[in-house]
């Protein structure tokens, strides 16, 4: 009887350990939500993108970056507001909090804009209702690297 009880307890411990390891698993590119495909029957509007957004996960190419790695690469994780035909970055620095904005165009169900540093960027809607922001930043040589921010509403 004790052997069976011990076996059951060990099995439960192993199950809990495995579940814990899975819960803390590093995000992978393959497990991220898919972009809404361009469908002739679906026409996204500005309202589909509007609101406040924060970065949930960041990828450099297809490699996941921790917040420390994002900072080490000189990239920023800033809240973003999309409203009134503009993409607005909420920047907090030594001067305090201020907004930096860029006008965008909505084409083929994507928001296209160029930030203040000349970096081209694209927002796309995800199948889960969130957004993905792709920035094409200079890297070694002449080849830009795509930095991808998976954006969610702050309350989620």
Model-derived segments and spans:
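N-terminal glycine/threonine-rich, aromatic-flanked beta-hairpin/loop signature
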Residues: 64-110
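Sec-dependent signal peptide cleavage junction
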Residues: 16-31
């Amino acid at each position: 009887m004790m052997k069976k009880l011990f076996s059951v307890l060990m099995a439960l411990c192993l199950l809990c350990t495995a579940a814990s390891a899975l819960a803390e698993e590093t995000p992978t590119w393959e497990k991220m939500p898919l972009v809404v495909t361009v469908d002739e029957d679906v026409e996204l509007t500005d309202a589909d993108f509007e609101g406040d957004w924060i970065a949930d996960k960041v990828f450099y190419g297809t490699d996941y970056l921790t917040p420390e790695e994002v900072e080490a690469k000189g990239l920023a994780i800033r809240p973003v507001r999309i409203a009134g035909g503009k993409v607005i970055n909420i920047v907090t620095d030594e001067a305090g909090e201020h907004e930096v904005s860029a006008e965008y165009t909505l084409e083929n169900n994507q928001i296209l804009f160029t930030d203040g540093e000349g970096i081209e960027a694209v927002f796309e809607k995800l199948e889960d209702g969130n957004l993905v922001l792709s920035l094409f930043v200079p890297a070694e040589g002449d080849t830009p690297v795509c930095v991808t921010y998976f954006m969610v509403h702050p309350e989620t």
